[in-house]
Amino acid sequence: MKRLFQNVIFDSSVAIPMSQSAPASVLATPALAFNKMSLSPSASGYRNRTSGGLNNVGSNGYYWSTAANSRANAYNLNFNASNVNPLNNNNRANGFSVRAVRAYTTDAEPLSYYHMKLSQRELNHLLTLAYLDARKNERNETAPLRFELNFEKYIRNLADRIYTRQWRPSPQICFIITKPTIREVFAPAFEDRVVSHLLFNMIAPLAERSFIYDSYSCRKGKGTLFGVDRFEHFLRGATENWKKPAFVLSADIKGYFMHINKAILYMELCKMLSKYSDRYISAGVRWDDIVDMHLADYLSGSIIFRNPTDNCIRIGSPRDWEPLPPQKSQFYSPMGTGITIGDVMSQLFSNVYLNPFDQFCKRVLGMDRYGRYVDDARAVAATEEFLEACIPSMDEFLQSELMLSLHPEKTKITSTRGENIFLGADCREHRRYCVNKTISNFKAAVYELESIFVQNDTPLHIDDYYIALSRLNAGLGYLSHFKEWRMADRILSDSPLNQIFAFASDYSRAVIKPEIKNILNTYDYAQIYLC
């Protein structure tokens, strides 16, 4: 049965936990209208298709009933104005529940099909594109291979369930990771990842229109290095190219992912879709013409309001969870709060949720030099007093509108004369440095590769060599943005890996030596003895 919540259609099987009441500004959100059809429930009588009026209302509105077309088990409302007792409760004892038994027209389509703008063939095509996105870098994994073996069957079955609103997220796999920090990760089933990419491909281009320029996480053309470049640009602007002192506000949100309120997240997403649905992309083409807003509403609601801990499969020992603080675990999150880490939609949802906060900092507080990556924000200003005055307003906005708060220990103001750290980079006057933690991680990766090649007594598969090459180039490529070639030289100059890999003079990249490559091209397995 469909129900209305703030004039937005939900599916009744998707629970909306409201253990924490949403702010008044969210509850007062204007009605969301993705199409021009009426969302009011069925009334007594039927809708005249010619005039648009109601016919055969009669004296008694008895069409809400526990049994189809039955008056015996429902309240009987008398519309006769001369009747002293307009509400006839003669069947009150049997009126335990009601459901609509008459529609506007006798030939109305089922709601799930009526709201579907896409044809099933178009949905199959979009699911195929989503499948290709979901399997990137994972094509040789078991789940994508199993899906690919019966590709047409799985795609058609998934499209049918989405088209008829029968799709529900499957139980997730839960495990603990320890690098770079200990975290709890919920991995969705591969089919659910396909659906997540379907929704992402639908609404991400539209969401990009609402985000500020300096929101860096999980956006095409943005990322950590882009964020570092912008932060360095802010520093140079505030200090007038390092000629004057300036100050940096480091703002961190406490327990961000675990404290996201699902009801607020859903309403923010609905407001965003409603705001841009009628806007034009090009001449005569609106977003509503190319994006099925009702499908986006259905999928986003199903994903947001799912409980990841329901029937989840834990991988690992229960002891793996002991070092994890309870406030960082979904198993201890209050009902109706928290989204999982490990899903492509979680990344987009995190940006949608904090978009009002970004707009507040930029437009209301006047922080021109403000940028954010997930829950870590930086603001640069010429005076310390300005930043100090902004902190209470920022914290108040987070608490009143988003039910979040600034971390009291990690939120601080520092001078640009000292360390200016953001996203693993320390930006100084003449150059940017890589933080010690990143250098230590690169050293650990090199030592691990050395142990694999030196201490292993069995031949290694050809893939192992190319995996090692990818790991080396990932670290060297990142360090090259910080001009850390001297550090890379100290780590790799005397390494046994030099017998397998050749490094560029500035240590920006590595390649497999030609003589080693010839061996790998001849044999699937090879053992190179290093000294």
Language model features with spans:
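A common structural junction motif
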Residues: 273, 277, 395-404
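C-terminal, surface-exposed recognition/capping segments
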Residues: 2-18, 22-107
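Right-hand nucleic-acid polymerase module
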Residues: 188, 193, 197, 320-336, ...
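Short, conserved non-catalytic motifs in the polymerase core
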Residues: 47, 139-141, 170-194, 210-222, ...
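Active-site-proximal segment of RNA-dependent polymerases
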Residues: 108-109, 114, 200-261
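Conserved polymerase palm-domain catalytic core
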Residues: 162, 240-374, 379-391
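Non-catalytic, polymerase-adjacent accessory regions of viral genome-replication enzymes
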Residues: 107-156, 522-531
